Design a protein with these regions (language model features):
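Extended, low-polarity transmembrane helix blocks
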Residues: 1-39, 57-65, 69-137
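Perimembrane loop-to-helix junctions flanking transmembrane segments
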Residues: 44-56
């Protein structure tokens, strides 16, 4: 039992379950952030950071798109790598613009999401995803 716990060997099934847990957990938690912004859009649009010179409303809309809608795609694992691109950009903005690169301070959560999203971008959605069902091969 101890030998199995300490072993560095992992099989494909373990990796796929880990990817599922990572995808769903990050997706649900981030969708919650996006849902809050979506449901309070009118109050937030005049206070939101204009991070690309597009205006506060457009910046908020892009953030809601990433945090809520792309997170839903991430949860089911559909178009996972495409859905991760806006999420990664959003977290880069959060870490380096909103939190001034303070990864050990207020930007820690955004940096953690960024690390998760980059990991998923590199590895993909895994076997237990809509991508695996629709895009075999």
């Amino acid at each position: 039992m101890i030998k199995k716990i300490l072993s560095s060997k992992i099989n494909d099934s373990q990796v796929n379950i880990a990817l599922l847990i990572l995808r769903v957990t990050a997706g649900v938690l981030m969708a919650h952030h996006g849902y809050g912004k979506l449901t309070h859009f009118s109050e937030m649009q005049t206070k939101f950071m204009d991070f690309m010179g597009l205006g506060m409303s457009a910046s908020l809309a892009l953030t809601v798109f990433a945090e809520f809608f792309c997170s839903l795609l991430l949860i089911i694992g559909l178009g996972t790598r495409f859905a991760l691109i806006p999420l990664i950009i959003t977290m880069l903005v959060a870490v380096f613009k909103a939190h001034s690169g303070e990864i050990f301070g207020d930007g820690q959560t955004a940096f953690l999401y960024l690390a998760i999203y980059v990991t998923l971008l590199l590895k993909g959605a895994g076997k237990y995803s809509a991508d695996a069902v629709f895009f075999k091969g």
